[in-house]
Curated annotation (Swiss-Prot):
EC number: 1.1.1.94
The protein's name in its UniProt record: Glycerol-3-phosphate dehydrogenase [NAD(P)+]
Residues at which NADPH binds: S14, F15, R35, K109, A141, R259, L283, E285
Organism: Rickettsia typhi (strain ATCC VR-144 / Wilmington)
Function recorded in the entry: Catalyzes the reduction of the glycolytic intermediate dihydroxyacetone phosphate (DHAP) to sn-glycerol 3-phosphate (G3P), the key precursor for phospholipid synthesis.
InterPro entries to which the protein is assigned, alphabetical: 6-PGluconate_DH-like_C_sf, 6PGD_dom2, G3P_DH_NAD-dep, G3P_DH_NAD-dep_C, G3P_DH_NAD-dep_N, NAD(P)-bd_dom_sf
Active-site residues (renumbered): K192
Localization (cell): Cytoplasm
Length: 320
């Protein structure tokens, strides 16, 4: 199978940098696109990104730039920005000339807003002719950067595209599986952050290991509920057993290295919850996703008790 000649990663945060490291270990021509000039110089000359990844050394062949005018020349462009910035990022890349010749791999997890919809649906409007894939898995940024073993699912409506991306990214420490179920992979990637908030709350309440295990079971049911109404799991539910769904869900819910689990835990133990929510500065994707998932629950009249419970505490309850 053919290799991509060169690969771009757009997004210089913790996940973007660590994902670029994964790709650079398997491909020679990899460039990280970012905005911060200080971090750019650090990556180029010291091969670190201390702000996001501490003193972890990045691959020596990893290049970096702030010059978006050249991104159109890359065969594969990996998008690794927060969900709230996703649509603006795609619109920006369009102004720099990306075309149907560029394959996109979306590593962002969440929904597009105004209106609330899957990222794939928004991409169908913004870039209808581009080959598109989606990546999700149990991938904590610092562990990726350290080259510790993990796995990921890669989805595309064109299985040949998914397989080509997987072929380019896979290594002994980064294994992949492929699927055409782009809907379930996206739904799981967005909802797992909400479930992780619930996991953190339960941990603070000392609910025990049994309760957290049952949370995983209930979470998979709610992923199934939303996925099916959005067009996922039309033939089977095997995708639930893959790295990008149950693997990512378990990691996010069980690790305090997860920002969402940490947020849920700290929220629950805080004495002044209004103040906590008002002053919490770290990006929590689950908190952002809540507002959007509630729109979908209302639109399709869905029963999703975990999401509704977390929303009643965090988003639409007395703590707003």
């Amino acid at each position: 199978m053919n290799k991509f000649k060169n690969i771009a990663v757009y997004g210089g945060g913790s996940f973007g940098t660590s994902l670029a490291s994964v790709v650079a270990r398997n491909c020679n021509n990899v460039t990280l696109f970012l905005r911060n000039e200080t971090i750019l110089k650090e990556i180029l000359y010291k091969k670190t990104n201390v702000q996001y990844l501490g003193d972890i050394k990045l691959p020596t062949n990893l290049q970096a730039t702030t010059n978006l005018s050249v991104i159109k020349d890359f065969d594969l462009i990996i998008i690794a920005v927060p969900s709230y910035a996703f649509v603006d990022a795609i619109k920006l890349l369009k102004t720099y000339g990306i075309s149907k010749d560029n394959t996109l791999l979306v590593a962002t997890k969440g929904f597009a807003h105004n209106p609330t919809e899957l990222l794939s649906d928004r991409l169908n409007t913004l870039l209808p002719d581009n080959p598109i894939g989606f990546l999700s898995g149990p991938n904590l940024a610092k562990e990726l950067a350290k080259n510790l073993h993990t796995s990921a699912s890669i989805a595309s409506l064109d299985i040949d595209i998914a397989n080509k991306i997987a072929h380019n990214l896979s290594s002994k420490t980064f294994t992949t599986n492929t699927t055409i179920d782009i809907v379930t992979l996206q739904v799981a990637g967005a909802l797992k952050n909400i479930f992780a908030i619930k996991s953190g709350i339960d941990l603070a309440r000392e609910q025990g290991a049994n309760s957290r295990a049952m949370l995983i079971v209930a979470a998979l049911k709610e992923i199934t509920t939303l996925s099916k109404v959005l067009g996922g799991m039309q033939k089977n539910s095997d995708i639930l057993l893959e790295a990008g769904v149950v693997g990512d869900l378990v990691l996010t819910c069980y690790s305090l290295g997860s920002r969402n689990t940490k947020f849920g835990y700290e929220f629950e133990i805080s004495m002044d919850k209004k103040k906590f929510l008002r002053e919490y500065k770290e990006l929590v994707e689950g908190r952002e996703a809540l507002k959007l998932v509630l729109d979908l629950i209302k639109k399709y009249n869905l029963h999703m008790p975990i999401v509704s419970e977390v929303a009643s505490l965090i988003h639409c309850g007395i703590y707003i």
